[in-house]
């Protein structure tokens, strides 16, 4: 992984299943057994959690606005990509929870949707978003001065704390929203992904954070498309069940729309990962080339 710096210087699925819900039409009726999971796990909670997240996703009012970059006067998509690539690197080196990263980028894009930011403050905004996300997600997190250090001391603690206040005020303290990794973790349990399969999906999921244009897709669609890519890559049979999960009412038109969204999102993700393999933004690829992530980024180099 790269060092810190200031960015202002420019197989078949197990056929055994467990019935877990009284609703016969629910895809959540079928959760595949996994020897690695606690067999006493009550799968009914998966359905409740998933649909509660889906409900929150549809009802949330303050969220990133696709197209916000057109209103920014001093920053652009490439600057955001460099910032996010750097934040992924910092997040890994700080050894933070996966949720912390996704929430930080959600806060970043939401703030940038409503606030004009000069380029000399963009890195400050980014590291402050990670700082805020740490406070919510982490039991123990780096000291304030460590967040300053990773910017090569471009800013000071007072500036960080003032930016924290400004972001929280602008977002009216609404910093929580369903994020892709929450949906994906449930899908991985439903379809019994092993470590290799799970990490391949995460590789695509973290890659999507870099591309500003992926904001047009909801968190649940991003998660479904990552699971779709995994299931197609490993030739898993039940990928079509992904089209049903977001449609609780078994509406054919809705399922068709969801299917189209998943396929388009997956297409863009594959294109993005291919381009990242050839770009200077190496944080995600380097991270997922490590053995702890099953070296999954190497799968995509010639695929």
Feature-to-residue mapping (PLM):
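Acidic, serine/threonine-rich low-complexity regulatory regions at protein termini
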Residues: 1-303
């Amino acid at each position: 992984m790269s060092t810190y710096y200031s960015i202002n210087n420019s197989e078949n699925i197990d056929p055994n299943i467990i019935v877990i819900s009284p609703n016969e039409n629910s895809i959540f009726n079928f959760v595949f057994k996994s020897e690695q999971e606690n067999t006493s796990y009550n799968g009914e909670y998966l359905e409740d959690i998933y649909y509660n997240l889906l409900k929150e996703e549809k009802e949330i009012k303050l969220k990133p606005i696709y197209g916000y970059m057109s209103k920014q006067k001093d920053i652009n998509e490439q600057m955001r990509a460099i910032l996010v690539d750097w934040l992924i690197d910092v997040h890994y080196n700080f050894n933070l929870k996966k949720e912390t990263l996704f929430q930080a980028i959600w806060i970043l894009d939401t703030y940038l949707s409503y606030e004009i930011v000069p380029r000399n403050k963009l890195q400050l905004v980014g590291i402050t978003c990670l700082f805020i996300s740490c406070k919510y997600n982490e039991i123990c997190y780096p000291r304030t001065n460590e967040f300053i250090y990773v910017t090569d001391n471009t800013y000071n603690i007072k500036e960080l704390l003032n930016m924290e206040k400004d972001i929280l005020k602008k977002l009216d303290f609404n910093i929580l929203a369903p994020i892709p990794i929450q949906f994906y973790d449930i899908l991985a349990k439903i379809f019994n992904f092993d470590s290799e399969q799970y990490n391949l999906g995460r590789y695509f999921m973290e890659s999507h954070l870099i591309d500003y244009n992926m904001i047009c897709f909801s968190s649940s669609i991003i998660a479904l498309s990552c699971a779709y890519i995994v299931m197609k890559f490993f030739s898993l049979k039940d990928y079509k069940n992904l089209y049903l999960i977001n449609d609780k009412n078994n509406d054919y038109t809705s399922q068709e729309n969801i299917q189209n969204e998943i396929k388009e999102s997956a297409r863009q993700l594959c294109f993005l990962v291919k381009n990242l393999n050839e770009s200077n933004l190496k944080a995600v690829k380097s991270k997922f080339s490590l053995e702890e992530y099953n070296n999954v980024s190497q799968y995509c180099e010639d695929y």
